[in-house]
Every structure is written in structure tokens, then in C-alpha cells.
């Protein structure tokens, strides 16, 4: 194989490896952010439950408000050479997105913060954003019975 051809192919492989590493990193971050978010929402629903509101929050994977499922899903869009990540929060017409930027900062209703900061302790703005989502989900389900309009 000619040296020039080898260099072309090696550059392609290097670019792919960089993309694959970024994709794996963003998948991990998105999954971790979703897990933290589910735990926070579970805590908020537990508070609702103490006030006799119809919620299900026995575990972080099965969350419901007034019988309507709350979904917290990591989303990773992988279109070579770009990787975008977010976490989608949805319930009965209410939705929010937590954006994970390429530099591992997280935007979730307030000033962006580093993912490493989330691992040390959850910022108050992140907790408040989750509370606003739970409120919106509750109010939307209460108004519509959980039926979303298109």
C-alpha cells in the first residue's frame, strides 16, 4: 500500500476513533444525568405523596403522577462526526430537556455547570428545574387527564 493511501486511511480511522470516544463519553454522561434526574423527581413525588396526591414513586424507574407515567430518557444523537446529548423529561404534555454540551457542561434551567460538579453535589438550580417539571406535569395531567394534544 502506498504511503499516501495509508495516511489517508489512518486519518479516517483516527477521526472515527475520536467520534466513537466522544459518543461513548456522551452516552455515559446522558445516562448518569438521567439517573440523577429520576432520583430527584422521585424525591419530589415522595413529597407529593405525603400530601395525599396520587403519585407512584416506589422506585426511580417507575414514576407516575395521577396515573400518568413520567419518562426521563437519555437521548444521544450520533451523526458522524457530531454527537449531541440531552435528557428528555415528559409527562402528560409537559416536557423539558436537559442539554449536555460537548464540553460536558449541563444546561438545565439556570447557569450551565460542569458534569463533574453534578457528581459532587446537585446544584439547587437543577433541583428547582426538576421541581418545576413535576409541577408542570401535575398541572397538565390534572387539566387534561394525561391526554396530550397534537
What is each stretch, according to the model?
Residues 27, 35, 47, 57, ...:
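Low-complexity, compositionally biased segments
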Residues 2-58:
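Contiguous, amphipathic alpha-helical segments that mediate oligomerization or scaffolding
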Residues 2, 82-85, 91, 127-128, ...:
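Short, intrinsically disordered, low-complexity terminal segments
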Residues 95-150:
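Ampiphathic alpha-helical segments that act as solvent-exposed interaction surfaces
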Residues 12-14, 37-39, 46, 50, ...:
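Residue-identity detector for threonine
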Residues 40, 44-99:
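Amphipathic, interaction-prone secondary-structure segments
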Residues 5-6, 10, 60, 67, ...:
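Intrinsically disordered, low-complexity regions
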Residues 33-40, 87-91, 100-102, 134, ...:
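Extended low-polarity, hydrophobic cluster-rich segments
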Amino acid at each position: 500500500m502506498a504511503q499516501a493511501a495509508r495516511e489517508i486511511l489512518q486519518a479516517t480511522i483516527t477521526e472515527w476513533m475520536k467520534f466513537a470516544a466522544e459518543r461513548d463519553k456522551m452516552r455515559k454522561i446522558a445516562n448518569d444525568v438521567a439517573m440523577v434526574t429520576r432520583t430527584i423527581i422521585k424525591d419530589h413525588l415522595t413529597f407529593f405523596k405525603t400530601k395525599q396526591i396520587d403519585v407512584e414513586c416506589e422506585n426511580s424507574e417507575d414514576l407516575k403522577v395521577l396515573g400518568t407515567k413520567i419518562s426521563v430518557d437519555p437521548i444521544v444523537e450520533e451523526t458522524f462526526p457530531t454527537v449531541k446529548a440531552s435528557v428528555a423529561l415528559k409527562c402528560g404534555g409537559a416536557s423539558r430537556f436537559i442539554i449536555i454540551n460537548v464540553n460536558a457542561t449541563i444546561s438545565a434551567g439556570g447557569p450551565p455547570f460542569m458534569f463533574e460538579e453534578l457528581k459532587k453535589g446537585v446544584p439547587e438550580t437543577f433541583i428547582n428545574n426538576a421541581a418545576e417539571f413535576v409541577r408542570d406535569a401535575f398541572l397538565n395531567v390534572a387539566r387534561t387527564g394525561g391526554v396530550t394534544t397534537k
